[in-house]
């Protein structure tokens, strides 16, 4: 009697071969006889026109305007001149008293009001209103404050932070500078996991370029307002994506979450008010 084999048994017999030689011979013979005499035929894969699957997606995405990923695939990541030609650092100038498309943001409150009107929320999962976090950090008393960019994404198959950091380093730096000016911070920190060497290299290179061009340093674009940035590589611990664990890691301690309150916006890095935003 021929032992019936199906697709799953074929896979098992190829990967989990019997230990005894005679059983191997018998299994192989059964497999060959099954293929020779079986009447079963494999079902061909079903094919659909592309518009059946892609049309609804295209209808949803086509009407959207890209913001964070604007000029995707068009702009060279490390080309500062191209970034400026496409409007880069214009909003930063507007926050320093300049004008962009007839608009200016002369005060920190006007920046926060604009963010509140936009409805911008955090992308870390909780969806906390960004304007509220900025407002709390700005109102927190203290001689020194920090801005931290959380680039430590640990979700399997998630590369949002990686894509943004690798593709738009100047855009992320500009956003950090604006955040620092708004909340009153003088130092920014990029916390990027070491598994993203290209992201680390591009952000580090972009920081050096911005320092040379006057966008970072003791006087941002000659405004007299200082802002310095450094890059820290994370060791890859999933828990360090949580903001209090991230701060503990920055302080050289074990990356473990702590109870809140106080929140980092009130008492964060080195006991100072700290704004932690996702990339």
What are these regions (language model features)?
Residues 8-279:
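Feature of Fe-S/electron-transfer and energy-metabolism proteins
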Residues 1-6:
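Short, exposed "boundary/linker" segments that immediately precede the start
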